[in-house]
Amino acid sequence: MSDIFSHTALSNLAEFSVSELSGSIKRTVETAFEQVRVRGEISGYRGPHSSGHAYFSLKDDRARIDAVIWKGTFSRLKFRPEEGMEVIATGKITTFPGSSKYQIVIESLEPAGAGALMALLEDRRRRLAAEGLFDSARKRPLPFMPRVIGVVTSPTGAVIRDILHRISDRFPVHVVVWPVKVQGEGSGEEVANAIRGFNALKPGGDIARPDVLIVARGGGSLEDLWSFNDEIVVRAAAESEIPLISAVGHETDTTLIDYAADVRAPTPTGAAEMAVPVRAELEAQLSGLAARLSGSVSRQMDNRRQGVRALVRALPSLDQLLALPRRRFDEAASGLGRGLELTTLNKRRAFERSASGLRPETLLNGLKHHRQRITERMHRAETLVERRLLQGKGRVDSFDSALRSLPARLLGQLERQKERVVTAARRADTAVLHRMAQNRSGLAAHDRILQSLSYKNVLNRGYAVIRDEENRPLTRAAAIASGAAVSMEFADGRVSAITTGEGTPAPETAAAPKKKPAKPASSDPGNQGNLF
């Protein structure tokens, strides 16, 4: 009897086809789990598919569930999913009746607390540091006075305006901006491509190669700044041949690009201050150096002049040099005559004493003989005296000539020394004037470049700038109301006008190109270059 009742109960159950049962299960599951919140670790993530969707799994230590993020949702995520990251996913459960599978369609994704992101960030930092990407030996010094500065940042917002304004105030130079996204999906790839793109520019090409790069972004949360922790961005910064300044977030924010950059700036404005010096300070230093150099040259010239005057005063006069030799010559000449007379007198007296006792013949013969000897001696004495006088006179003349030529040689040496001093002073003056002329020429060239990039050159070709009553430029017809007071600026002046009708936008066609985001107004648009 029990078997009969059991068979009857089973035969009363509703019968389903496989499709009907799968559809019923699908409706039950999707109704019961229409909105769920799941915590798990990302597994099998390989980035978005070519279709733009992202497929991966969420797992814990006991189970795994497939997950998908559709393309539209993926582009709105605040941070990029990564393999091994612990997240909290919010979405709905869907099933596939044809294969008896289910998955979660994620509508929002967030890290499982800041601790999970910080742990992932620290692990990545240690791994890249072990490769040597953060070594201080890789870092390069910034150029003292760059000619071109490359900026990688968003083309809109306050960051680029602050950088351009600060550079213009300190030392106006040419700035090239590479516009990128600084948040969201794909922003990391754009920043890395911009850094590599600047490094790929050739010197002397159509686009000036920067001398220094600034990678900048405003402040934000850890998720907002996560793109600058991407490994691709860090490697691009470390491989950059151009010195790079990191200016991401506020002073308290730290990203991995800060470790790979050559210099970290606390803010984007601080990066602009690091990139260029203050022009007024350079001019003051140059003026001070020129004044010091001029004063040093003047002091050297004065010292040399005083030395020459001291040497001239120390030289004796010609009369003083010849006084002693002349006195000695006069004494020698006067003593020679007196000695000769004394010798002759003594000989004569001796002769007279000897002749008193001789016979006349002997006396005559002896006298004749002595006279002859005396005559010969007198002749030799006269000859000797004349020779000695001539020798003495020759020596005196030679000494006199030497004494006369001595002041001339000293004066010649002094003149040559004076010429050397004057030549050195002229060379120093010429070098100083040449250097100052070069500096003035460089400053004039920069001024001409600034003038050539002024928007007023565009007005000279027939264009005009229309401004409202608050002097703001009007760039859209739809922004002008009927009866509004406007001013039109031409190359030669301004004209006031009143509009007679409301502005209407130009009709768009299907083939119209995509509009570019309007750039913010700048006080001096000529300072900013652009690649696009």
From Swiss-Prot:
Keywords: Cytoplasm, Exonuclease, Hydrolase, Nuclease. It is found in: Cytoplasm. Its main location: cytoplasm. It is an enzyme of class 3 (hydrolase). Its EC number is 3.1.11.6. One of its GO terms (cellular component) is cytoplasm. The keyword Nuclease applies. Bidirectionally degrades single-stranded DNA into large acid-insoluble oligonucleotides, which are then degraded further into small acid-soluble oligonucleotides. Belongs to the XseA family. This is Exodeoxyribonuclease 7 large subunit. It comes from Agrobacterium fabrum (strain C58 / ATCC 33970) (Agrobacterium tumefaciens (strain C58)).
